[in-house]
């Protein structure tokens, strides 16, 4: 059994056990409303992130078909994450006015339709533009889903529901990458977009039908002066600024590595197919373990020390990818990803401790910088690939992570 067949077998086994466990937990909750909420939000998170990240594993396919550099091809993802980062700042307050469910449902529907339209285009500029609109639409789910959970779910069940939603995000992003890489290899990227688009369209209809309307939502008017003032206060907070910068560097590093590792593995001495490269997305599931593990460790040890250890793990994993052995590269990516998810978990959870007012807006700012880092570094890394190949990418990311470690030294427990 080769390593890819083995990884596929492990994936299907873990998914079966995961969903069996979820089924039993949901059964214990035993309320129709709760079941509808968790399953709808899982589906919403799954669809959103499968749309967002379906392009990442097929960037070399775009490069070949449209005669693009790696930098230009990465715009299909960077354009979406850039507009999504901007949308997260403003969609939240808009949902305070017109409602949570309507924002999320319309966002999913629009994103699905845009993905289907994207599948029939053969103009790269149009595709990037449509992807930018798709990212803006998806910000309606990213920025609102967690607020809906806090408002509508009993406090004792919030953690489980939040975890299931985040699992939907992770598994959706992983599945989108795998499915698009397989369909692009055996059919075309057009077919990949059509399949993912229509699946998401059906998901948005099920989401709209099954998700209960908000019972604890009360519309409020938007006070733009207060809105901008809160942003200003957060940006004046030195600790929050450091956390925003670390989030910016974390996501930028993570996306850059997975944007360009596919180009490396398609070359000598690996010559991997796009579908095999797509299955590397299974590595993302390391976050299911490392994120909660980091949460346990920061309650026992110094939070900033655990953050620095996680960042050092990312550097260690990245150094391992310099070898020309596929097993060592995969192991390096696993270590790198584990460090990333642990670091992100620590940094994002720290926001609430230092935001004294308007914590939702503080979280929105973190997400803004988080996805902005994905857009900027994810595209800028292409220049390092063009001139220096993988050693250039690795050096670029290691420098970024060293800066993140230096910034973390200024953080107190």
Curated annotation (Swiss-Prot):
Principal location: membrane
Keywords: Cell membrane, Membrane, Transmembrane, Transmembrane helix, Transport
CDD domains: MFS_NepI_like (cd17324)
Top-level division of the source organism's lineage: Bacteria
UniProt record similarity statement: Belongs to the major facilitator superfamily.
Keyword GTP-binding: no
Localization of this protein: Cell membrane
A single cellular component GO annotation: plasma membrane
Transmembrane segments: 42-62, 75-95, 109-129, 133-153, 157-179, 191-211, 238-258, 265-285, 304-324, 326-346, 362-382, 383-403
Membrane topology of the entry: Multi-pass membrane protein
PANTHER family hit by this protein: BLL2771 PROTEIN, INNER MEMBRANE TRANSPORT PROTEIN YNFM
Any one GO molecular function term: transmembrane transporter activity
PROSITE patterns: MFS, SUGAR_TRANSPORT_1
InterPro entries documented for this protein: MFS, MFS_dom, MFS_trans_sf, Sugar_transporter_CS
Stored Pfam families: MFS_1 (PF07690)
Identification of the protein by name: Uncharacterized transporter BUsg_567
Organism per entry: Buchnera aphidicola subsp. Schizaphis graminum (strain Sg)
């Amino acid at each position: 059994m080769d390593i890819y067949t083995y990884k596929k077998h492990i994936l299907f086994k873990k998914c079966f056990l995961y969903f069996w466990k979820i089924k039993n937990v949901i059964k214990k909750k035993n309320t129709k409303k709760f079941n509808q909420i968790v399953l709808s939000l899982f589906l919403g998170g799954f669809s959103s992130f499968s749309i967002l990240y379906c392009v990442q594993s097929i960037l070399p396919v775009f490069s070949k078909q449209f005669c693009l550099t790696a930098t230009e091809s990465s715009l299909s993802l960077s354009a979406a994450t850039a507009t999504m980062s901007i949308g997260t700042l403003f969609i939240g307050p808009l949902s305070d006015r017109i409602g949570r469910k309507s924002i999320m449902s319309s966002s999913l529907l629009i994103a699905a339709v845009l993905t289907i339209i994207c599948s029939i285009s053969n103009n790269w500029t149009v595709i990037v533009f449509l992807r930018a609109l798709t990212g803006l639409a998806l910000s309606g789910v990213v920025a609102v889903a967690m607020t809906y959970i806090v408002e509508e779910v009993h406090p004792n069940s919030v953690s489980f529901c939040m975890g299931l939603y985040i699992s939907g995000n992770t598994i959706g992003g992983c599945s989108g990458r795998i499915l698009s890489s397989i369909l692009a290899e055996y059919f075309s990227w057009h077919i990949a977009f059509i399949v993912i688009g229509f699946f998401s369209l059906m998901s948005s209809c099920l989401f709209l039908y099954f998700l209960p309307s908000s019972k604890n939502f009360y519309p409020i008017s938007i006070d733009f002066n207060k809105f901008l003032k809160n942003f200003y206060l957060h940006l004046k907070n030195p600790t929050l600024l450091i956390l925003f910068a670390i989030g910016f560097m974390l996501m930028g590093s993570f996306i850059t590595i997975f944007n360009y590792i596919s180009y490396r593995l398609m070359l000598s001495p690996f010559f991997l197919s796009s579908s095999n490269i797509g299955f590397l997305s299974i590595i993302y599931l390391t976050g299911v373990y490392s994120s909660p593990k980091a949460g346990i460790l920061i309650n026992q040890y110094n939070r900033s020390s655990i953050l620095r250890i996680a960042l050092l793990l990312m550097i260690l994993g990245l150094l391992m990818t310099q070898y020309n052995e596929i097993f060592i590269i995969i192991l390096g990516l696993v270590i790198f990803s584990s460090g990333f998810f642990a670091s992100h978990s620590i940094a994002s959870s720290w926001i609430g401790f230092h935001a004294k007012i308007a914590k939702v807006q503080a979280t929105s700012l973190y997400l803004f910088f988080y996805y902005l880092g994905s857009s900027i570094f994810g595209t800028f890394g292409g220049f390092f690939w063009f001139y220096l190949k993988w050693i250039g990418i690795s050096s670029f990311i290691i420098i970024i992570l060293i800066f993140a470690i230096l910034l973390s030294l200024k953080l107190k427990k």
